[in-house]
Amino acid sequence: MNQVVPGRRSESTDPRALRTRKALVGATVALLKTHPVAELNVSQIVKEAGVSRQVFYQHFTDRDGLVLATAQDMIKEAYEGFAARFSSDRDFEAAVTALMTTLTGHYEAAVHIIDSPVHSMLDQEVVAIMLPTMREELRSRADEWDGADEQLLDDMASFYIAGCQHLLEEGVREGASPEEIGRRVELVRRVLIRE
């Protein structure tokens, strides 16, 4: 399920390759709104995108590689922005709400991605984006904990990220508004840090 293979055009900066990639990702988003990943095949995707199978395989090794690229396009920039402005001492609820607003109109597609083989790879990317930020946020509180070392900070950061990610995914499954998801995550944050 490699997304990028040497010689593939999925990461090319050539305008034609970018247009093709955009068409494939757009087609995948559209199909994911009504089809679980397990029901999608390359033939459906290329038909929806208006490209040939040959062109598809010039960009991606398989369907799951494209689904992962689609999921990354849907959330990666939003998570990077969230990590950049993250601070649990400021308006965390607003930050979560802004993050979830990026998925408005794409909940069905997001649920199908959550239920797909690429879900764990996508979660790993979220952890990679959020871990340094969360680690530093927790470091500022480490004086309150006896024996807090780097391993404990990493473990706690991973724990917080996974728990938050679970709440976000459950909110999407339930069709909750970005504001409701933000409120729920904020309530949990307050309890965990005893505010």
Language model segments and positions:
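Secondary-structure edge/capping motif, primarily at the C-terminal ends of alpha-helices
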Residues: 81-85, 110-117, 138-144, 171-175
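Helix-turn-helix
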Residues: 31-65, 69
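Generic hydrophobic, amphipathic alpha-helix propensity
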Residues: 16-28, 45, 70-74, 78
